[in-house]
Amino acid sequence: MKINEQYHNLNLLENITYEFLGRDGETHEETESILVEHMMDVYVNERLTMKLVCIPEHLAELVLGRLFTEEIISSADDVEQIYICEFGKRARVILSKNKSGQPHEENEDYVSPTPTCCTGNRVLNDYFITDQPLMPVTPIPWKKQWIFDLADCFANGTPLHSQTWATHSCFLACNGELLFQCEDIGRHNALDKAIGYALRHNIDLKKCVVYSSGRIPTDMAIKAIRAGIPVLASKASPSAEAVAMAKEYQLTLICAARR
């Protein structure tokens, strides 16, 4: 797999001046850094397949992880090349010949439901989706200290969240070692970035623990299960349906993991 990233140091923040209003009626101007929403179109074999709203860093990881969790690819070997333009606005993905894609019977474009906290993300067509059944993950032994350490990493602060309080974050670890951390507007994007990082660097997700800063509804659980991640931890709470899904597919789900 070849990855060609032409973008460098795109703006993540923008300074704005606003009027502050206090409870005592006092008003004054303040300046603050706020997060930038970045739009990126993803073309797979020259076909517009996704529109993503994100922050413009770790874009190749985001694309790779999203292709994986949307079942467009089953491994990094299915990708021949990922190209990200200099503005980070367009990603071009070339699949390997054995994943060239066959049209479904009607092959009509559609817009999928938008996941919560991933503002504006859309899957535009199902041309490459394989509809593979969800398979149980293989549980692994894990240590509670690993989870405490990841909760501490989050509590110690991530760069953009510390400045804006406007991002979710995700941490990828294996055998108690932190391998990668990232931030994004939405928790789904952050999880996809962590998954994409593992795929890009040949890390076996079946041996990994992932920690998310966000809630765990079913769509987050499905991403972890599809990726084969055995342990998913979160600072926040799960939904009842996500708990039921974790039991059914043998996903170890650890929530309210915070310092």
Segments and roles (model prediction):
Residues T164, I185-H188:
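Alpha-helix initiation and capping sites
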Residues N175, E183-I185, R215:
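Histidine- and/or cysteine-centered catalytic micro-motif in compact active-site loops
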Residues K2-N175, F180-Q181:
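Intrinsically disordered, low-complexity regions enriched in acidic/Ser/Thr/Pro/Gln residues
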Residues R187-R259:
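Feature captures the catalytic cores and cofactor-binding loops of soluble hydro-lyases/lyases
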